[in-house]
Swiss-Prot record:
Family from the record: Belongs to the peroxiredoxin family. Tpx subfamily.
Gene3D superfamilies for this protein: Glutaredoxin (3.40.30.10)
NCBIfam families the record matches: PRK00522.1
Keywords from the UniProt entry: Antioxidant, Disulfide bond, Oxidoreductase, Peroxidase, Redox-active center
Function: Thiol-specific peroxidase that catalyzes the reduction of hydrogen peroxide and organic hydroperoxides to water and alcohols, respectively. Plays a role in cell protection against oxidative stress by detoxifying peroxides.
Every Thioredoxin domain range: 16-162
Species lineage: Bacteria, Bacillati, Bacillota, Bacilli, Lactobacillales
Native organism: Streptococcus pneumoniae serotype 4 (strain ATCC BAA-334 / TIGR4)
GO molecular function annotations of the record: thioredoxin peroxidase activity
Protein's UniProt name: Thiol peroxidase
Length: 163
């Protein structure tokens, strides 16, 4: 059971598993352009999904994955949240992570529905991490049971480095 603020929450859709192909998406960047999974073809991808960039755990998650993984060869870290692109851009500037790739699902929540991350009760994304190989096959996934907890950084980082 997944909880948020100590209460059970529900989702629509089926959780993705290791071995599944990642689903395509159309998300909004901080400059209001659109990005899809295809825009990162040929690269290893870490999808770091957070409820809101302006919370402590989400900020820590975004910073840690960017600091530890963005320098890996042929690897991109994509942070996805429901935050407006303006808030994501402001956060990057304030945190000195100007090169972080921030993607917003605010427009139609399709990423959240497709990846079974849209919290029905809150219209926020649940916390999760997906590590994809260059063919967009999921090699590691964690749907965090307690959204107010950090993901398993060590396992996700090890999975990304092993690709």
């Amino acid at each position: 059971m997944v909880t948020f603020l100590g209460n059970p929450v529900s989702f629509t859709g089926k959780q993705l598993q290791v071995g599944d192909k990642a689903l395509d998406f159309s998300l909004t960047t901080t400059d209001l352009s659109k990005k899809s999974l295809a825009d990162f073809d040929g690269k290893k991808k870490v999808l770091s999904v957070v409820p809101s960039i302006d919370t402590g755990i989400c900020s820590t998650q975004t910073r840690r994955f960017n600091e530890e993984l963005a320098g890996l060869d042929n690897t991109v870290v994509l942070t996805v949240s429901m935050d407006l692109p303006f808030a994501q851009k402001r956060w990057c500037g304030a945190e000195g992570l100007d090169n972080a790739i921030m993607l917003s699902d605010y427009f139609d929540h399709s990423f959240g529905r497709d990846y079974a991350l849209l919290i029905n009760e809150w219209h926020l994304l649940a916390r999760a991490v997906f590590v994809l190989d260059t063919d967009n096959t999921i090699r590691y996934v964690e749907y965090v049971d307690n959204i107010n907890s950090e993901p398993n950084f060590e396992a996700a980082i090890a999975a990304a480095k092993a690709l």
